[in-house]
Amino acid sequence: MAGEEEAVSNKQVIFKDYVSGFPKESDMFLTTTSINLKVPEGSKAVLVKNLYLSCDPYMRGRMSNLPPEDPNFSSFQPGSPIQGFAVAKVVDSGHPDFKKGELVWGVMGWEEYSLVTAPDQRLFKIYHTDVPLSYYTGLLGMPGITAYFGLTDICSPKEGERVYVSAASGAVGQLVGQFAKLMGCYVVGSAGSQEKVELLKDKFGFDEAFNYKEEHDWNAALKRYFPEGIDIYYENVGGKMLDAVLLNMRPHGRIAACGMISQYNLQQPEGVHNLTSIIYKRVKIEGFVSFDYFSQYSKFLDFVVPSIREGKITYVEDIAQGIENAPAALVGLFSGRNVGKQVVAIAHE
């Protein structure tokens, strides 16, 4: 930390104000400030240069004016940088566990440089660099943890069971399907375009897939793909899709409630009408968030890293270039514009 402080410009994506309905690019704006490339003397903070920013559906919730119930889901602060998962390189450190030049992933501001004041709570070191660094925004980061533990811990899949994944081509869904296939399950996914449907079958190895936008009766579609019913539903959509799934669950089926992207931008969320199916089919539904499992990150890596190296898992990313394109990339999630995990590359290592 010794030496003369060096100040550099720092582009930031600022959150303008709380959002109602679909987010727009104009709900964010770009500004440039300056930042010293040294952590404050005596501080245990870590200063990082951000390389990749992660765009994730949960961020829409943080754009709303939320009650302060859960610090993991607090609102973004108007006038401050958007916060999200990112991959970064340590520029300077006052913390004994983080050294200059090391690569990390965790929660950062949407900016070129971030000062992380609680690195032991917010940062994970990157040890495996024989894969694309951007994977730590997805496959090897929060979405991967979400996919793996939502499937294994909540749903406990058994060989031969029938698994349905909604929003299946997204950051989490594409992994759930592949993990379930590795565990010997029959897997069907739904997505919003023919391109994504083909991706599910040809790239990710799903047994079947369908375009939900071309199906006028989702109950009938699910009966077609699951004539004997669904054992496991990995829930990413909510609303009418959840209603249709409940009619098609098998006795003692399990539902991991990961997200409900169809509801995030509605002024009035849709109700669910087929809840009695939960009772007479003895269906288990459990909600969870990725933070619940961060302490088990090493267990996840033990499973997924060998699978990547052996070519058993593949991952598709949609990478936008430049921090100035980050607002459009985030907003595009909610119209299905992305194909695969949405990432923004803002610097090279």
Please provide the spans of the model-predicted regions.
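Eukaryotic N-terminal low-complexity, Ser/Thr- and Lys/Arg-rich leader segments
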Residues: M1-N36, H348-E349
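C-terminal capping/lid region of NAD(P)-dependent oxidoreductase domains
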Residues: A2-N10, E310-I319, P327-E349
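Glycine-rich beta-strand-centered segment in the early N-terminal region that forms part
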Residues: N36-C55, M63-W110
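Short, well-ordered loop/turn sites that connect or cap secondary structure elements
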Residues: D97-F98, P157, M249
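A structural motif shared across PLP-dependent enzymes of the aminotransferase-like
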Residues: V107-L123, Q296
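Mid-domain Rossmann-like dinucleotide-binding core that forms the NAD(H)/NADP(H) cofactor-binding site
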Residues: L133, T137-E215
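Adenosine-nucleotide cofactor-binding segment
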Residues: K181-A244, Q267-P269, F291
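Glycine-rich phosphate-binding loop and adjacent beta-alpha segment
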Residues: V237-I313, A347-E349
